[in-house]
Amino acid sequence: MDFYTQPNNGYVIVRETGNTRNMLGICLSEKPESSVVLIGLDSSDELYKKELNGKKILQQVLMAVSDIYEEFDKQFFVKKIQYVKTDSPPESIYRYLAFEILRSAVLNIKPKSEIVLQEDDSDLLVISLL
């Protein structure tokens, strides 16, 4: 797995194993948000034709936030979630990915580099390494 940071308190994790691929971006907030922005990104390299369920991904990320609180007694507030709509199922993998992002933040694990997930009008995934 590759772990990156994003500007504005964000993190990205990319998991590729065999023929599966998952990308998750999370932006954190200093305080609880009234709602979480959920962005399903398109990719020109569509691995699967069926789209992942964004609401299930949101649930998995929020469960990981709860898991982190139980294990480390550290509270996180999520303001934005980014994922690729045609990445590999199942959605349950996003709980693990979110947990790894947050665990890395708690343990102050240094990321590979900084990355920007650009969201344009088409929501096409464009990754820029800084």
Question: Which residue stretches match the model-derived regions?
Answer:
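Accessory interaction regions appended to the cores of large information-processing enzymes
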Residues: 1-130
